[in-house]
C-alpha cells in the first residue's frame, strides 16, 4: 500500500517515477518479443498466456493501434511474476550473444576470403598451415576463379563458393573460435596502416 508509514514516516512502496520506469522496461521487453521470429520466440520461456497477445501485436500494423496493443501486452506482462520476466530477459540476452558470435564468425571468414584474394599464396599457405585438412587445390582454384571473375566483372560465383568452403572449414575445425591466429594477423595489419 502506498503512502507514508505512520510510525517511521517513510514512504511505502515504489515511487511513481519508479513505477513508470518499471512499466517502460516491461513495454520495451514486449517490443523485443514482438520483433522476434516465431522460431526465436519458441526458444524463449514465454508463458502461453502471452503468446496470443504477442501474435496479435505482430499482426497489427497501424502505428497507433500497434502501440496500443503493445501497451496491452505490457499490461499482461506486468501480471507475470518477476522470475518469469527475468528468465525472458536472460534468454533474450543469451540469444543476442549467440547472434553476435555468429556475426563475428562470419566476419572472420570474410576476412580470410579477402586475405586469400589480396595476398594469394602467402595467405593460402598460412591457412593450410593452420588447417592441414583443407583442400589446397580447391582453394587455389576458387581464389583464381574469384580474381578472374572480379577482373571481368562477372557474377561472383567463385567468390561466394570460396566463402562457403571457408565457412565449412571454420565449422569443422574451429576457425570461428579464432584458433587460426587471425586476430594476430589483424592487429599486425592494423599496425601497418
From Swiss-Prot:
Member of a network of 50S ribosomal subunit biogenesis factors which assembles along the 30S-50S interface, preventing incorrect 23S rRNA structures from forming. Promotes peptidyl transferase center (PTC) maturation. This is Dual-action ribosomal maturation protein DarP. GO terms for biological process: assembly of large subunit precursor of preribosome. CDD domains: YjgA-like (cd16331). Belongs to the DarP family. GO terms for molecular function: ribosome binding; rRNA binding. Residues 181-193 have a biased composition (Acidic residues). The gene is darP. HAMAP family: DarP. InterPro entries: DarP, DarP_sf. NCBIfam families: PRK05255.1-1 (NF003593). Keywords: Cytoplasm, Ribosome biogenesis, RNA-binding, rRNA-binding.
Amino acid at each position: 500500500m502506498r503512502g507514508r508509514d505512520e510510525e517511521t514516516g517513510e514512504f511505502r512502496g515504489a515511487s511513481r517515477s519508479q513505477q513508470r520506469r518499471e512499466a517502460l522496461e516491461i513495454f520495451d521487453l514486449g517490443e523485443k518479443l514482438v520483433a522476434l521470429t516465431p522460431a526465436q520466440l519458441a526458444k524463449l520461456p514465454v508463458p502461453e498466456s502471452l503468446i496470443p497477445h504477442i501474435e496479435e501485436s505482430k499482426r497489427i500494423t497501424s502505428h497507433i493501434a500497434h502501440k496500443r496493443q503493445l501497451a496491452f501486452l505490457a499490461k499482461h506482462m506486468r501480471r507475470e511474476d518477476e522470475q518469469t520476466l527475468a528468465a525472458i530477459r536472460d534468454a533474450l540476452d543469451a540469444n543476442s550473444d549467440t547472434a553476435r558470435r555468429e556475426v563475428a564468425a562470419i566476419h572472420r571468414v570474410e576476412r580470410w576470403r579477402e586475405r586469400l584474394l589480396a595476398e594469394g599464396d602467402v595467405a593460402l599457405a598460412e591457412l593450410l598451415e593452420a588447417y592441414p585438412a583443407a583442400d589446397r587445390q580447391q582453394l587455389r582454384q576458387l581464389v583464381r576463379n574469384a580474381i578472374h571473375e572480379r577482373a571481368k566483372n562477372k557474377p561472383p560465383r567463385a567468390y561466394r563458393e570460396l566463402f562457403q568452403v571457408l565457412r565449412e572449414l571454420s565449422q569443422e575445425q574451429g576457425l570461428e573460435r579464432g584458433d587460426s591466429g587471425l586476430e594476430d594477423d589483424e592487429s599486425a595489419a592494423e599496425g601497418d596502416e
